[in-house]
Curated annotation (Swiss-Prot):
GO terms for cellular component: cytoplasm. This is Co-chaperonin GroES. GO terms for biological process: chaperone cofactor-dependent protein refolding. The lineage of its organism: Bacteria, Pseudomonadati, Pseudomonadota, Alphaproteobacteria, Rhodobacterales. One of its GO terms (molecular function) is unfolded protein binding. Disulfide bonds: none annotated. The keyword Nucleotide-binding does not apply.
Length: 95
C-alpha cells in the first residue's frame, strides 16, 4: 500500500539499534531504548501560510534525521513499524 503524508507531515523509519554491547552482551528488547534517529520514507508537500502560499519542506525521502524521543505517532504500514510526525518535530538532518 502506498502512503503519502499530508501537509507538513513526514513518514520516518527508525534505524535499527544494536543487538549487543561493545563488550558482547546481548541487549534484550525490554532494555533497549528506541532510537531517535531515522530515515525519511515520505513527505507531504508542505504547510500553507494563511495567504495560501506553500512553505516547502526542508527534508526529503532518503534523508537521515534526528528527532525528539517522544516525537511522532507510531503506525504499522505493510508490516513495517514507522512514525508519522510533523516536520517541526525533526531536530536536524544528518549528513
Amino acid at each position: 500500500m502506498a502512503f503519502k503524508p499530508l501537509h507538513d507531515r513526514v513518514l520516518v523509519r527508525r534505524v535499527q539499534s544494536d543487538e549487543k554491547t561493545k563488550g558482547g552482551l546481548i541487549i534484550p528488547d525490554t532494555a533497549k531504548e528506541k532510537p531517535a534517529e531515522g530515515e525519511v520514507v515520505a513527505c507531504g508537500e508542505g504547510a500553507r501560510k494563511d495567504s495560501g502560499e506553500l512553505i516547502a519542506m526542508s527534508v526529503k525521502a532518503g534523508d537521515r534525521v534526528l528527532f525528539g524521543k517522544w516525537s511522532g505517532t507510531e503506525v504499522t504500514i505493510d508490516g513495517a513499524e514507522l512514525l508519522i510526525m510533523k516536520e517541526s518535530d525533526i531536530l536536524g538532518i544528518l549528513s
